[in-house]
């Protein structure tokens, strides 16, 4: 890997169709440095779902970036793009379907939604202590699963007894909705009925060494942005120096923890600051060590770390400690944003990472 470009004043960024788009907090910049949008108010995160880009400002308005125009949607927060004419939005502390061609709202829920998953014109969402299934355009409830049915859990470090909560709606495989809970466990719900089909409170098998062996909750799952690979039928995630893989093709699903301590030690690195988010492309998992200012690549087939970079050159500031805060991959390029708002672009010249 070699760094081929460095762009300053980047607040957040996206890669769409192999092209870089980013916001500097006041402006959205497209390919070749072309300005797409300038806002008088501070902007938040740039989003994309075909066919639109959209970005909210700090006051709850949203800019909808269309092919031939930019529309300012006052007091409207876009949650999702349903089609080229329909948006799912938050307005007046409620959830509505907004017809952008006819400028009409149809309220479907009397509350705002935050964590949700769209699948075949249905939404699966978290509402307080429940997981619900609804039809998108009508708001009709299909089912509801109460997390209270799972009982309570005890924090292994404080002995505090707490309710279960949804940390992440991961995805759907074979008509099962997979959910990661705050107590570091997984549940699988039937998407037609909402009934609990599977519960995985801890992994079944451990392979390899890990620096987490002394942890009180050592059979639990670490916080991570777990991903579902529908082609392989597997859920996987990375936390600290642990790689988790859940095989959904087995009955019941089987969870394996792979300790990567020795893999990290090959590069004289400790895997104690791996970021929760990562990217998987062509059986390679790209991750960052956010405090060590490095990034690496794990082969998820062999469970071997095949590359770890040298520390990324950053400009330190007197008032803060620089970290890596975002990583994206597009074909042979790796994009890494640091906390000083500098985007570093690396190019991979060989698949075996010999450079």
Ranges and model annotations:
Residues 1-355:
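Secretory-pathway ectodomains
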